[in-house]
C-alpha cells in the first residue's frame, strides 16, 4: 500500500529512477549506501592535465564547460574533464555521483559521459546521470537522443525521452520507462517521491546528507511511499517526517541511518 506524507513543500519535477546494489553485512543488515569522504566546500582544482570539480554533502554546483555545455552537479559528486576539453574531437567527462547535463549541440564533436561501468554518448541533449560508488549506473533522457553502453564495449542502447537505462555490475543494460514524477527534485531543492520504493528514497537521502543507509529487514526495501520534503532541512527533520509515516522506524547513529520494522 502507498502511504502519503504531508510535506513542508511540494514541487512538480522530473525524477531520475535509480537502482542500488545490496551489500549484506555479517549480521544480515542490508547496507544500500555508504558514507564517503567529501570536501567541506565545492572545489575546482587542476589535477595534472585535468580539471576536477567536487561538491560536499547537501550542496549542488553549476559547472560551465569550455564548449558552453552546462552541468548541474549533485550532492557528494565529482566531475573530471581534460584541460584541453574537446580539442581532440571528443568532449569527454567522467562523473561519480549525479548530475544534470545540458549539452550544446556539436555534430562534429560527440559528448561522452563516463560513469562507473557506463558510457553515455550524445551530440546535444538534456539528461540526468547517476553513478555513486557501490550502485548501478543509470541515465534518464529528458530530450534529444543518447546512446548508452557498458564499459566492456558492447553494443549501445538508444534511449528516447522519458526512458532510462540502468547498467548493473555485470554490464547488462536494462531500458525502461522512467518515473518522471521525481527525477529532478534535487535540482529544485526537494525530495520528490511518488509511490517510490523505500530503498530508492533512502539512498537518495543517503547521497544528499552523506550518511550510510542500512535496512534491517529485506521486506522494507520494496515498501512504497509518497514523500515530498525540502532538502534545506536537517537530517533529523527528514527522519522525523519519515517516522511519522508509520511504515518503519528510522534511527541515525554513528554516520548511518538504520531502518527497522516497527
Regions found by a protein language model. Give the residues of each.
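A residue-level detector for the "anchor" residue at the start of short, highly conserved motifs
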Residues: 2-6, 11-262
